Structures are given as structure tokens and as C-alpha cells.
């Protein structure tokens, strides 16, 4: 993978950690994210229409598939943040997606993964696990697995699968349509799928707009711009590699926790970050 692609993924990953922090601070997490997606789709409209193309039946199938899993992702992530802490949910959601996407990439997309690339993906997964530890002692080694018993962790894990699923559809989609036009269609369809929740929770919608309108708009811009960067990378790179490198957002999340939320920068967080960086280097050389 080229340095330009890795740099774009780094920027997208940083933006991803920023909007997750803003989403965690919101009131109704699911409504907040749906409103952000709606605003993002509206902002993208003129740019997408300028790149409009004829849409084949295959492209529509891919768009619908992506929209379904993207809708599920926002619902699951919002549900997870409503039940658990950012420090638990974010690493689990981002850390599980590389595992799923490698399986999907190899067995469904028929991507060939070199031994160095596979080792890099494995390092990223291990690094995210280490970063998730509270301390280096036997009592804490199984803590990340024990946490899977909670509903919040289960939602986070499912959101990781949703990321892998829509990433697989998107890998195909950007080969069929212009990335901007494709993303607008998938995003717009996601809004339609999620619209019933907005209608059913009108009071929550009004309250969220009243209390968090600036954050909603900020997240809308960040989600839209950040994922467009990823789609451009997917045009010329393996989905398994691109999605795995996006796991660096967990490192950015830990750094934000230390700087913004004044969380302690523990040895596991430092070592986990270094392991993730080593994994990214391996993928870059693959």
C-alpha cells in the first residue's frame, strides 16, 4: 500500500475518533447519529448530482447492501454508547472489524493476502487487545473477553461486523460508480431506512437538535469527508488492508482520552499503540 493511501487512512481514522467522541457526549446517541447522517447526505447532494451516472442492477444491489449494514452500524454503535463507556466500546468496535473484513475479503471478495499483510492485520488486532488492557497482570488478561458478556460489548462487536460488511460492499461499489455519487446514494438510502426511528422519537429529535445542533453538523461533515477518503483508498487497495489500518483510530482515541478527557496513558496503551503501528508498517510493505 502506498504512503499516500496510508496517510489518507490516518486522516480518516483521526476524524473517526473525533466524531465518536462527540457522539458519546450527545443525549440520545442513536438519534444524534441519524441526524448527522441525514445532514451529511444533504451536504453531499450537489457534489453527488454533478457526478451522476447510470446505475446498473448490480450497482443498486451493492448500494442497498451497503446502506443496510451502514444503518445497522449507526444503530448498534449508538446503542452501545448508550450502555457503555467510550474506552470500552470504541476499541472493541474498531478492533473486531479487521478480523471480519479479512475473512470477508479472502472468502467472498477473493482478495489474496500476503503473509506480511496477514501478519500486519494480526498485529493490529493484538495491539488493539493490548491497548484495551487495564494493566499487565493475570487478573486483567481476560478482562476484554469477560466484557463480552455485557449488552454494550455485544452491540460493539456487532457494529464491528457491520463495518466489515458495508466495507465489502463499498469495495465493489467504488468500482461500479464514482465514489462521491455512490456514497451519496448509500448514505441517502441509509437515512430512509432510519427515518422511522426519527418519526417515532420526535421529542428526542427536537431535544437533540436544541442541545447539540453544532455537534450534529460537525459530525455530519466529519463522517462525510472522512469516509470519502476511505472510498478513494478502496478504489486501488484491498478492503482487508484498508479496514485494518483504520484500526489506528483506537490509538487516536486513546490519545484524545489522555489530552481531552485527562485519562491516564497506561503502559498497555503505549505498548498497544506501538504494536498497531508495527502492523501498519507491515501492511504498508505488503
Where are these regions (language model features)?
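Specific alpha-helical transmembrane segments that line the substrate/conduction pathway
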Residues: 69-70, 82-129, 183-191, 239-259
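Residue-level recognition of transmembrane alpha-helices
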Residues: 36-37, 93-94, 117, 177, ...
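Selected transmembrane alpha-helices and immediately adjacent juxtamembrane segments
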Residues: 148-181
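Juxtamembrane helix-loop boundary signature in multi-pass membrane transporters
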Residues: 1-7, 99-161, 268-286
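Membrane-interface interhelical linkers
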Residues: 1-68, 74-86, 133-155, 188-224, ...
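Small-residue-rich packing faces within the transmembrane alpha-helices of Major Facilitator Superfamily
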Residues: 38-42, 125, 191-192, 252, ...
Amino acid at each position: 500500500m502506498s504512503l499516500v493511501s496510508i496517510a489518507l487512512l490516518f486522516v480518516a481514522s483521526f476524524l473517526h475518533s473525533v466524531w465518536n467522541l462527540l457522539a458519546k457526549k450527545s443525549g440520545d446517541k442513536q438519534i444524534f447519529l441519524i441526524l448527522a447522517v441525514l445532514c451529511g447526505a444533504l451536504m453531499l447532494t450537489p457534489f453527488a448530482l454533478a457526478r451522476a451516472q447510470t446505475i446498473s442492477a448490480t450497482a443498486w444491489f451493492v448500494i442497498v447492501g451497503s446502506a443496510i449494514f451502514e444503518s445497522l452500524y449507526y444503530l448498534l454503535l449508538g446503542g452501545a454508547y448508550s450502555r457503555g463507556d467510550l474506552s470500552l466500546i470504541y476499541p472493541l468496535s474498531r478492533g473486531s472489524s479487521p478480523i471480519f473484513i479479512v475473512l470477508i475479503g479472502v472468502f467472498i471478495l477473493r482478495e489474496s493476502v500476503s503473509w506480511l499483510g496477514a501478519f500486519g492485520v494480526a498485529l493490529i488486532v493484538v495491539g488493539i487487545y493490548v491497548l484495551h488492557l487495564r494493566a499487565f497482570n493475570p487478573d486483567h488478561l481476560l478482562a476484554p473477553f469477560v466484557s463480552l458478556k455485557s449488552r454494550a460489548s455485544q452491540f460493539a462487536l456487532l457494529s464491528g461486523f457491520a463495518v466489515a460488511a458495508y466495507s465489502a460492499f463499498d469495495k465493489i461499489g467504488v468500482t461500479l460508480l464514482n465514489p462521491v455519487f455512490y456514497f451519496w446514494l448509500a448514505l441517502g438510502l441509509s437515512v430512509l431506512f432510519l427515518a422511522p426511528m426519527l418519526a417515532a422519537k420526535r421529542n428526542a429529535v427536537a431535544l437533540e437538535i436544541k442541545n447539540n445542533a453544532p455537534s450534529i453538523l460537525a459530525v455530519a461533515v466529519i463522517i462525510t469527508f472522512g469516509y470519502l477518503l476511505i472510498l478513494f483508498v478502496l478504489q486501488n487497495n484491498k478492503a482487508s488492508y484498508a479496514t485494518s489500518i483504520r484500526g489506528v483510530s483506537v490509538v487516536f482515541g486513546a490519545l484524545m482520552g489522555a489530552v481531552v478527557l485527562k485519562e491516564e496513558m497506561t503502559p498497555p496503551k503505549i505498548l498497544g499503540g506501538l504494536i498497531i503501528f508495527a502492523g501498519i508498517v507491515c501492511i504498508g510493505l505488503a
